[in-house]
A protein has these predicted regions:
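Small-residue-enriched hydrophobic alpha-helices in membranes
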Residues: 1-165
Length: 165
C-alpha cells in the first residue's frame, strides 16, 4: 500500500472544517519532501476540496498547481490528460453531483490550457460549467427580484420565464 504524506493532515482539516494559510504551507512542505504527488495524495487533496468550504486564499493556487502538475507533467505521456484521468477527477470532485467550486473551475481551465491536445470531454465539461454558472446567476437574480417585490411574485402579477426559474 502506498503511503500518503498528507493523509493525517487532510483528515484533521476535514474534521476542523477550515483550511488556513499555515495549513496550506504545511501541505506544501509535506509534499515537497519526497517527490511528486501520488494518486492517493491527489485523492486526498480532492477529498479536502470537496469536504471543506472555508478555505485559505492560498488554497486555490496550491490545489490547481499540485493537481495540474500531477495530471499534466508527472504522468505519461507528458502534456496530456487522458479521458480516464479526467473521468476519475470529475467523479472524485463530484462535478456531476455537487457541481464545481472556484478551485475546480480553475483546475479544469488550467488543465485545458496546459494540455497539448485536450480531450474533447474537458472542453465539454468547461462549457457545461459556464452554462450552469450562468443559470445559477439568473436564478439568483430572479430570487432577488422576487424578494424585493414579494407582492408581485405571490399574486401572480409577475411572470417568470421557465428558463429563468
Amino acid at each position: 500500500m502506498t503511503k500518503s504524506r498528507i493523509r493525517s493532515t487532510i483528515s484533521l482539516l476535514i474534521e476542523r472544517q477550515k483550511v488556513e494559510d499555515a495549513d496550506v504551507e504545511r501541505l506544501r512542505d509535506l509534499l515537497a519532501a519526497g517527490g511528486g504527488l501520488s494518486t492517493i495524495e491527489a485523492g486526498d487533496l480532492v477529498r479536502l476540496e470537496r469536504h471543506v468550504r472555508e478555505m485559505s486564499p492560498l488554497w486555490l493556487s496550491f490545489f490547481v498547481e499540485q493537481m495540474a502538475t500531477y495530471f499534466i507533467w508527472e504522468r505519461r505521456p507528458t502534456g496530456q490528460i487522458s479521458e480516464r484521468d479526467l473521468e476519475w477527477l470529475a467523479f472524485r470532485l463530484g462535478l456531476d453531483s455537487t457541481g464545481a467550486t472556484p478551485s475546480t473551475r480553475a483546475l479544469l481551465t488550467i488543465l485545458s490550457e496546459e494540455c497539448v491536445d485536450p480531450p474533447p470531454n474537458l472542453k465539454k465539461r468547461l462549457d457545461g460549467l459556464s452554462g450552469a454558472r450562468a443559470r445559477r446567476q439568473r436564478q439568483r437574480e430572479v430570487a432577488a427580484m422576487l424578494s424585493i417585490m414579494p407582492s408581485l411574485g405571490s399574486q401572480g402579477g409577475l411572470a417568470v420565464h421557465p428558463s429563468l426559474g
